[in-house]
Regions:
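Short C-terminal domain-edge/linker segments immediately following a structured domain
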Residues: 33-39, 73-77, 117-123, 147-152
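Glycine-rich phosphate/pyrophosphate-binding loop and the adjoining helix
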Residues: 142-178
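Residue-level detector of flexible, active-site-proximal loop/helix-junction positions
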Residues: 12, 48-50, 123, 150-153
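Helix-loop-strand module that forms the ligand-binding subsite of alpha/beta enzymes
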Residues: 51, 55-142
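N-terminal beta1-alpha1-beta2 submodule of the flavodoxin-like/Rossmannoid cofactor-binding fold
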Residues: 1-86, 96, 165-178
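Noncatalytic linker/hinge segments flanking ATPase motor cores
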Residues: 43-49, 86, 127-137, 155-166
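Soluble non-cytosolic domains of exported or imported proteins
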Residues: 22-26, 96, 124-128, 157, ...
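Structural beta-sheet core signal
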Residues: 5-7, 43, 89, 118-120, ...
Length: 178
């Protein structure tokens, strides 16, 4: 069996370190691409049919409304994960958990019996509620401990050996098969 990475990310206006800045590539996407280079597995992006606004504060309000209303945005596609036994799932932290797009992916995917290796990007909240929420959506999965990283560190991941070392140590603790 093999491993795959499934991630959700958002570029544009984002909270970066201590303020709002425009980023060309989302933090979680950069982290997912780095992990893919290290372990050589397939990579799938979770994309919603709706487009989130580019403006940071408005986007956070959209995310809050989705969470409060238990609204699951429709996804463009759902990857077929049958041939994978290990799934790395990456996402930003929005309102103390993963975005509802990730929740939609989790509830529509059969991840029962698979090893789930979650990771997230954030700007200070850490994993927050996402570990317990992941268990709700994947009750029959073998869920590893989360890896969490400040999102702004992903913007220079290729030039930051300390960040690379932290990621690589986490990957070593979560051996996978390709």
């Amino acid at each position: 069996m093999a491993s795959a990475i499934v991630y959700f990310s958002r570029a544009g206006s984002n909270w970066v370190n201590d303020g709002v800045a425009n980023i060309e590539i989302g933090n979680t996407k950069l982290l997912s691409q780095y992990i893919q280079k290290q372990i050589g597995c397939d990579l799938f992006e979770i994309k919603t049919k709706k487009t989130y606004t580019d403006e940071y504060y408005k986007a956070t309000e959209e995310a809050k409304e989705e969470l409060e209303n238990n609204f699951f945005p429709e996804l463009i596609e759902y990857p077929d994960l049958n041939k994978y036994d290990t799934i790395y799932i990456g996402h930003p932290i929005w309102w103390s958990t993963f975005p509802m797009a990730v929740a939609e992916f989790l509830r529509k995917s059969n991840l029962s019996g698979k090893t789930i290796i979650p990771f997230c990007t954030h700007e200070g909240s850490g994993v927050a509620n996402s570990a317990s929420d992941m268990k709700k959506y994947v009750p029959n999965g073998n869920i590893a401990d989360y890896f969490e990283i400040r999102g702004y560190k992903c913007q220079n991941i290729e030039g930051d050996t300390k960040t690379q070392d932290n990621i690589n140590q986490w990957l070593d603790r979560n051996k996978h098969s390709n």
